[in-house]
Structures are given as C-alpha cells and as structure tokens.
C-alpha cells in the first residue's frame, strides 16, 4: 500500500496499540466508581479554590466540592480552567482535521497506523476504509469563548482548502487514496501546545 520510494528510515513498533477514547473513558469511569468515586457529568466548573498556594476545592454550578487534588482534563478549555487556579498552561485549541474514506476492497481491519512526521499526517484503517488525519505545524486556532459553554462532541465546518495540502501528502504516501471514495471530512477542536509536544 505504501509508497516508500523517498523513505530513508522508518520504525516498526509491533507492540504498539490503539485505544478507543470512549471505551477507555467508560472503563476508567467504571473502575473509579467501583472504588468509591462519584462522577458528576454536565456540571460546569466556575472556579478553583486555593489556600496557601494549594487546591482546596472546586466551585461548580451545583456548589463547592472540597478536594486537595484535581486532574485537569478539560480539553480545549484547559487554559481557561487552569487560570482559575492561577496556573498558566501553554495550550490553545485549534481545528483538527481528518478524512474518512468509504470501505475499500481488500482493506485489512488491523492495519498498523502509519505516521509520517515529515508530512504531518497519520493514516489508519477505519470501518473497512481509511482514516487520514493531520497534525499540521500551523493549525487554525479557535477562540474557545466563541464556541459556547455547551459545546461538546460537536464538529466545526469543513475546510477542504486547508486540508488539501495534507491530502496531497497522504496520496503521495498511500497512492490508493487517489481513487478512494471519500465518506467525509471531519473537523473538531483539539488542544495543542506551541511546540506540538506533550505537556
């Protein structure tokens, strides 16, 4: 499948894996509840209380939760949420694009994920077709305040002009994409650091 004519080096990681984010979240929730944790969904955070430089509580739309520790898992609102505790977190939300093809003949359901860091793309199998995604170096920033506080699990408008250079790179690496029927282009917000690395 892969055009490797211009590849000078590669890494094969047969022990790597892929996790379904929704399944992982459900498993973590189940495990936490079995150990006594209480989960409050759809509960907006309005502030983080501190005392002597340490967390002592979280203010929510339903009242205050006393706690000495928090896990900042607020995605595109991470910068704003951390600021409630006086902490600067170097993340900013950007549009994140990926394309799905319709099923392709002979497509293996367990293909390894192809990451081409020089071309800022990743490709993997998805429901009999392919998923082509990108982590471009100059992402399109989003002001999270423009999305609204109830924004969750929604998509942003398509932008084929922005995705076109990534698609060209993907077709170079995987020529089968040139004739692959496109199912859809998706655009959802993700948080990124200025250098693209993890925190």
PLM segments and residue spans:
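Active-site lid/adjacent beta-loop-alpha segment flanking the redox-cofactor pocket in flavoenzymes
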Residues: 103-199
